[in-house]
Amino acid sequence: MRTILIFAFYGYGKVHLLVRRKTVSGRLFIKVKKILSAVVAAFLALGSLTACNAAGAKGNKKLQIVTTIFPEYDWVMNVLGDKASGADVTMLLDNGVDLHSFQPTAADIMKISSCDLFIYVGGESDEWVEDALKEAVNKDMIVINLMDELGDAVKEEELIEGMQGEDEEEHDHDHDEDHDHDEDHDHDEDHDHDEDHDHEHHHHEGEIEYDEHVWLSLKNAQVLVKSISEALQKIDASNADAYKKNADSYIGSLKALDEEYKAAVDAASNKTILFGDRFPFRYMVDDYGLTYYAAFIGCSAETEASFETITFLSKKVDELSLPVIFTIEGKDKRIAETISQNTATKDQKILTLDSMQSVSSSDVKNGTTYLSIMESNLSVLKEALK
């Protein structure tokens, strides 16, 4: 079963259609560029409005910054510090929608088109970005791809013992179907420009998939905050010293919390955690040498665990005498509860580690920050490491 999602926007005197085709096993994005005489007239007003907005933006001293996810947004706000009043900062995923299911609107694309700084993760879920950037009105825009910034620190998805893989039969069917049409390969032509993003395309070339959840490492966060600071210093040189000072101070806070995590793990007798859920915390556990077991990989769309997966994880809880079974935020806890019910003691705590994939703008207004979530996660993690 597939869904076709179509939206149009005006750019360079033409009406463009972005067609997003989503299958169960993955996402495929196709850009169809047509000059539609029948609908151009209907979009003339929109085109004029866009042009006016772009012109107005040049006369507006406020920086225009667009981020996709909450961690990026919060990092930007910390680097801006008391200069935040001089910037309009947008978080596209502001209603708690998961990165993996996000569908950009025409308004989102237009906002990106004229911004000064655009920040996105750069994984498989962001395949729509490449086409969006091709339509950018502001050719001086600075773009930060988190996964590109981290380079070799980016990790491949891994399927470990006991973890349930994707439905192979369904995947094979969709894979074959996706290659039935020549137009599905139009995106190959889009790779000519010199700002290709390696991590975005590796999984197409060799079927390697990279773990997108890079923000869940405090070490990665330090690197990325520095990149954001350097970008802001280029865009707004008059406030460069302030941005550097703010970034240095914030990075100091990230380092301090990183040390707290390390100390907690070093002092723990148990260094294994188990998730009755998908597992987006690969970067975090690797930072501190923790072992993990989980029902699904981090980007899995699976929601029902097999009998074999439940049995394996239940036995692992018994074998290691694990006191906690984890889930991630906003998820059904039935798998974790079923694992516990199949253990010998049936008394494990079901706790949540927050992967920051459902943070909304209202949460931000209520004081949620990247550091506050990571501090809370540390408190919860300590429960499991006793």
What residue ranges belong to the model's regions?
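Extracytoplasmic metal-acquisition and chelation regions
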Residues: 37-38, 51-386
